[in-house]
Amino acid sequence: TGGPGVGKTTIVRAIVALMSAKMRRVALAAPTGRAAKRLGESTGAVAMTLHRLLEFQPRTQSFARGAHDPLPADAVVVDEMSMVDTELFRALVAAMPVSAQLVLVGDVDQLPSVGPGAVLSDVIASGCATVVELTEIFRQAAASKIVVSAHRINRGELPDLDSAPGGDSDFYFISRE
């Protein structure tokens, strides 16, 4: 987990490269089409929505993949995990092969799921999984006042409000009179 610009995508790219080098099958998924597309573009691998990965059947409102027919993967990486609700996560866990690894990637301070539950936060709080929290801002994100301000706010600090509209900054404070 970690905020914007801390290297979550870089870590996922490295996981995919390492697993591929070991001839292991990696499935990449995200809760939305847009997030899946970004995940695929950033890793150079095929990524899909969780519903597509689990082979959602609209007629029966169920998934074809489950304990009876697990996913053909040695590892499953789910990005934007904060948007996954409990029902979808339950279906994913049920479809995991016994020996497969599950990697959950997301920012607990980002968009919550529309459906019930705060799965990523709950998994982290449970202590049942190994958690890596990335905190250092890298590359172009370090120059973005939006990213820096978001991190400051998450730490309970005030952002730098000195930027004037029309300047070189990407973050402005507009005073209301």
Regions of interest found by a model, annotated:
Residues 5:
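Walker A (P-loop) phosphate-binding loop of P-loop NTPases
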Residues 17-27:
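Post-Walker A helix-loop "phosphate-sensing" segment adjacent to the P-loop in P-loop NTPases
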Residues 108-177:
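Conserved helicase motor core of P-loop NTPases
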Residues 8:
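Conserved lysine of the Walker
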Residues 86-100, 118-123:
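Short, conserved "post-DEAD/DEAH" coupling segment immediately C-terminal to helicase motif II
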Residues 11, 15:
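Hydrophobic positions on the alpha1 helix immediately C-terminal to the Walker A/P-loop
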Residues 25-30, 34-95, 136-137, 146-147, ...:
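Conserved P-loop NTPase motor core of helicases/translocases
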Residues 1-2, 30, 80, 106:
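The Walker A (P-loop) glycine that initiates the GxxxxGKT/S ATP-binding motif of P-loop NTPases
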